[in-house]
């Protein structure tokens, strides 16, 4: 093939272990005990891990994770999730309102299918769903799959990608002649935008949804990937409960996953969805939708969920190793996020909000007119052209902003903070060199 000026292609997608991030020992030890119960007698394994594994195995058929579970997931794991949510928010969670899923994307599919098919409402008109732009492309795909009506709303880039209630009201009013608006998707921390929403912003969104009778769907899979003391993750459930009894009937669906954060177990496909504010009749319909048993989530994935929701505690034999591994990963994330933000903002005609959560940066780039025209000649969008040229010159496979959505006339690309620390600075040296040469090549007098 044609030789390239690089010796490695760096793919910028959100798969921590694909970038060499080490697994968390306690999770893998739990999983190995469940897969091979003879490890319960292994003296080198921490006692607390073996005890957790034994309790999960006792909840399965014939002491084996090879059997189907209840379609909602093992009760013991749902109890672990409820305890995790209760500790996180300071408000009790009900295991009966928690359903285990094959990863976060399956939780999205189940929730949107329920909204679209009338499982959660009696309205027969086409369901409308408000989704953030920029946002996770999976929502657009599911909207098409379930024949829903897409209601895109723009995040405010000038205000650190916050949700703007004026924007929400505008797009909602415009959508009403075309659909029956049923829900709003909120992604926090943001993908691809890398921000963590403030408490007040979340409260505003909840009040907006309450006024408009919308189900709030909280995509919180990056909740444990906040790596700066300057911001704090606030769950929608916590903010909702703080609003008091007046909001007890507010309808909220929240998802979490073992795929992201310092665990990064994308391949295990473990997740959960919590449903609150719905009547017993609606919950019964939702549970029927998840039946029969052959729709049960992967037991290995359920074990991963148990591990992230029931981690080692102080005093446990495994705790010292666990906290050391966790802090090593999180400290590395923080350093790489800082380098990423600084390096991107040092590039001419590039601006990037601080990366404070999730795994991504989403910088805006002002492209020369000649580059925009060249993109048209190559039958691609300007941001696709920029990312394509970056790949050809550096081997860095960034993702163009149009895949996530962006305001017309603006151009972005997404990078991840997952490459190893040894590769981050050399990677940005290559990006900086490419960017300078690209701008120089396509700049004209009109751009000055």
Residue ranges: model-predicted function:
Residues 17-23, 139, 192-195, 212, ...:
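Short catalytic/ligand-binding loop motif for oxyanion handling, primarily in non-cytosolic enzymes
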Residues 372, 382-426:
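Active-site-adjacent capping/gating segments
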Residues 18-19, 323-334, 338, 344-393, ...:
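Conserved PLP-binding catalytic core of the aspartate aminotransferase-like
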Residues 1-21:
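N-terminal low-complexity, Ser/Thr- and acidic-residue-enriched intrinsically disordered segments
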Residues 1-6, 167-177, 245-246, 317-321, ...:
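Eukaryotic N-terminal low-complexity, Ser/Thr- and Lys/Arg-rich leader segments
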Residues 26, 30, 36, 48-56, ...:
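Conserved core segment of the aminotransferase class I/II
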Residues 11, 81, 98, 129, ...:
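Generic structural signal for small/hydrophobic residues in well-ordered secondary structure
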Residues 25, 31-211, 217, 223-246, ...:
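Conserved core of the PLP fold type I
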């Amino acid at each position: 093939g044609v030789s390239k000026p690089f010796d490695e292609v760096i793919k910028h997608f959100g798969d921590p272990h694909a970038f060499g991030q080490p697994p968390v020992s306690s999770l893998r030890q739990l999983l190995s005990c469940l897969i091979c119960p003879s490890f319960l007698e292994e003296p080198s394994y921490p006692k607390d891990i073996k005890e957790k594994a034994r309790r999960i195995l006792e909840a399965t058929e014939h002491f084996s994770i090879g059997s189907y579970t209840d379609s909602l997931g093992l009760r013991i794991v749902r109890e672990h999730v409820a305890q995790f949510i209760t500790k996180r928010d300071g408000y009790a969670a009900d295991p009966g309102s928690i359903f285990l899923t094959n990863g976060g994307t399956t939780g999205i599919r189940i929730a949107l299918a329920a909204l679209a098919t009338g499982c959660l409402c009696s309205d027969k008109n086409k369901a409308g769903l408000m989704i953030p732009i920029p946002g996770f492309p999976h929502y657009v795909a599911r909207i098409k799959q379930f024949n829903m009506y897409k209601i895109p709303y723009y995040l405010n880039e000038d205000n650190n990608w916050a949700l703007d209630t004026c924007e929400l009201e505008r797009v909602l009013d415009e959508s009403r002649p075309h659909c029956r608006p049923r829900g709003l998707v909120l992604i926090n921390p943001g993908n691809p935008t890398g921000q963590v929403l403030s408490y007040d912003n979340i409260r505003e969104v909840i009040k907006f949804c309450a006024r408009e009778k919308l189900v709030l769907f909280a995509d919180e899979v990056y909740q444990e990937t906040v790596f700066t003391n300057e911001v704090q993750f606030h769950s929608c459930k916590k903010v909702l409960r703080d609003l008091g009894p007046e909001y007890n009937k507010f309808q909220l669906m929240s998802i979490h996953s073992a795929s992201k954060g310092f665990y990064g177990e994308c391949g295990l496909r473990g997740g959960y969805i919590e449903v609150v504010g719905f009547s017993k009749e609606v919950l019964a319909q939702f549970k029927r939708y998840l039946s029969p048993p052959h729709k049960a989530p992967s037991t290995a994935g359920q074990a991963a969920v148990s591990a992230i929701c029931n981690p080692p505690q102080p005093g446990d034999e495994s705790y010292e190793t666990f906290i050391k591994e966790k802090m090593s990963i999180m400290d590395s994330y923080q350093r790489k996020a800082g380098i990423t933000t600084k390096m991107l903002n040092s590039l001419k005609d590039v601006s990037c909000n601080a990366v404070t959560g999730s795994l991504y940066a989403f910088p805006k780039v002002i492209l020369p007119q000649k580059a925009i025209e060249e993109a048209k000649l190559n039958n691609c969008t300007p941001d696709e052209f920029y990312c394509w040229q970056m790949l050809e010159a550096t081997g860095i496979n960034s993702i163009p902003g149009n895949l996530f959505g962006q305001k017309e006339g603006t151009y972005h690309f997404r990078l991840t903070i997952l490459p190893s620390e040894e590769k981050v600075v050399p990677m940005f040296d290559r990006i900086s060199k490419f960017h300078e040469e690209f701008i120089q090549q396509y700049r004209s007098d009109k751009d000055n």
